Amino acid sequence: MYNNKLKVCSGPETTGWISEQLMTGKIPVTDIFIDIDNKPDQMEVRLKPSSRSSTRTCTSSSQTEVNYVPLLKKVEDTLTMLVNATSRQNAAIEALENRLSTLESSLKPIQDMGKVISSLNRSCAEMVAKYDLLVMTTGRATSTAAAVDAYWKEHKQPPPGPALYEENALKGKIDDPNSYVPDAVQEAYKNLDSTSTLTEENFGKPYISAKDLKEIMYDHLPGFGTAFHQLVQVICKIGKDNNLLDTIHAEFQASLADGDSPQCALIQITKRVPIFQDVPPPIIHIRSRGDIPRACQKSLRPAPPSPKIDRGWVCLFKMQDGKTLGLKI
């Protein structure tokens, strides 16, 4: 009876059941540990299921390993390709960043030239408007003023020759209702009003605003809110009030061309341009010392009796408590 159960059952459950039966004495020890020589059949029966199970398990494990090896190889190859592609992409991005940095550095001088070019453009437009009054065409230069007038009235256009008019004479013709002046000439005369400031003295010197000059000087100075930044504001304000921004700009560029530092160039302006000589610095009203920029704190000094800009006094800070501090460079 016991042997039949052994033939049917196998695995851990059988082992546990046999141990329980042995401990309780329900199965004799001789029925379990049989003699191979005397009972070969029973031994064979007991070992066969174990042998088949072991073989089946081994075969299944080997089959699983065989199935996973190609998949793992594919995953490894794919990851390798992905890493290589990412490395190439990173290298390309780094090269692109370097190119962009180089390009940005190359374009900075052009950006600085933009303001000067804009001023030149305005001056050139005014100059063209002024010369547009000289209504000149190619051809013979024998037409008199009367002949030109007659030709205009008849053909509604200038004759094929030069027709030069003085400004006052042309103004008289435009104001005279009996005289005929082509619309193009009248328009050119009106445009002359915008060129009234363009004279022989300032021709070729493009007008620059106080804001543009301040930005140009700021671009050359390191840091922010320093005593020299404050000096730039004072220079631009006084230069604007005296209509000498172009002169100040020329002095600044000349000092830089001579190899001076931006700070030295600003000091030279206060010493060379006459409007800064023996001029007291402006007074700035503040609530307390904390309103003064941090970068200027170390340059504050007690104000002397008569400070001057050309002696290094940029401005005076007057606080609500009556105390006055001077910004000295």
UniProtKB/Swiss-Prot annotation:
Sites of Phosphoserine modification: 194, 306
Top-level taxonomic group: Viruses
Coiled-coil region: 84-112
Start and end residues of each VP35 IID domain: 204-329
GO biological processes: symbiont-mediated suppression of host cytoplasmic pattern recognition receptor signaling pathway via inhibition of IKBKE activity; symbiont-mediated suppression of host cytoplasmic pattern recognition receptor signaling pathway via inhibition of IRF7 activity; symbiont-mediated suppression of host cytoplasmic pattern recognition receptor signaling pathway via inhibition of TBK1 activity; symbiont-mediated suppression of host toll-like receptor signaling pathway
Keywords, comma-separated and alphabetical: Coiled coil, Host cytoplasm, Host-virus interaction, Inhibition of host IKBKE by virus, Inhibition of host innate immune response by virus, Inhibition of host IRF7 by virus, Inhibition of host RLR pathway by virus, Inhibition of host TBK1 by virus, Inhibition of host TLR pathway by virus, Interferon antiviral system evasion, Isopeptide bond, Phosphoprotein, RNA-binding, Suppressor of RNA silencing, Transcription, Ubl conjugation, Viral immunoevasion, Viral RNA replication, Virion
N-terminal signal peptide: none
UniProt entry tagged with the keyword Transport: no
Entry GO CC: host cell cytoplasm; virion component
UniProt-listed Pfam families: Filo_VP35
Function: Plays an essential role in viral RNA synthesis and also a role in suppressing innate immune signaling. Acts as a polymerase cofactor in the RNA polymerase transcription and replication complexes. Serves as nucleoprotein/NP monomer chaperone prior to the formation of the large oligomeric RNA-bound complexes. Regulates RNA synthesis by modulating NP-RNA interactions and interacting with DYNLL1. VP35-NP interaction controls the switch between RNA-bound NP and free NP and thus the switch between genome replication and genome packaging into the nucleocapsid.
Membership in a protein family: Belongs to the filoviridae polymerase cofactor VP35 family.
Quaternary data: Homodimer. Homooligomer; via the coiled coil domain. Interacts with nucleoprotein NP and polymerase L; VP35 bridges L and NP and allows the formation of the polymerase complex. Also interacts with VP30; this interaction is regulated by VP30 phosphorylation. Interacts with host IKBKE and TBK1; the interactions lead to inhibition of cellular antiviral response by blocking necessary interactions of IKBKE and TBK1 with their substrate IRF3.
Name of protein: Polymerase cofactor VP35
Species annotation: Reston ebolavirus (strain Reston-89) (REBOV)
Gene this chain is encoded by: VP35
